[in-house]
Amino acid sequence: MIDPEKHRKLIDFAYAKCLEIPRRKKHCSIILCKNKILAVGINRFKTHPLAVKHGYLFGEVHSELDAYLKCEKRDGLELWNFRFNTHGQMRISRPCPKCLPWCMKVFDKIYHTMD
């Protein structure tokens, strides 16, 4: 079961990160291990060899991959995905069909926001 206090802190942290994103689609991924934040990623317009390998289009790196590339640890990881609209309301932010297969391989648990 998810600790409500931990969940609230992650939502607040992710929302603060999303406010820094200048684009309309504000996705934030947080990687945790033993309740410690190891890496944070956002959707970015840039290229990376792993993005090409996994079929990303338009030179975009999704927040899951952006966070994973920053994370040095490779086991016991939890992925938390968040998305907020321009009014600060949470929206669906589950991994896309291109991200989901590799996310299921590298993360022990995956959580995402819903409408």
Regions found by a protein language model. Name each.
Residues 26-40:
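Short beta-strand scaffold segments in enzyme catalytic cores
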Residues 40-115:
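Zn2+-dependent cytidine deaminase-like catalytic core
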Residues 1-26:
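Short, basic/aromatic recognition patches
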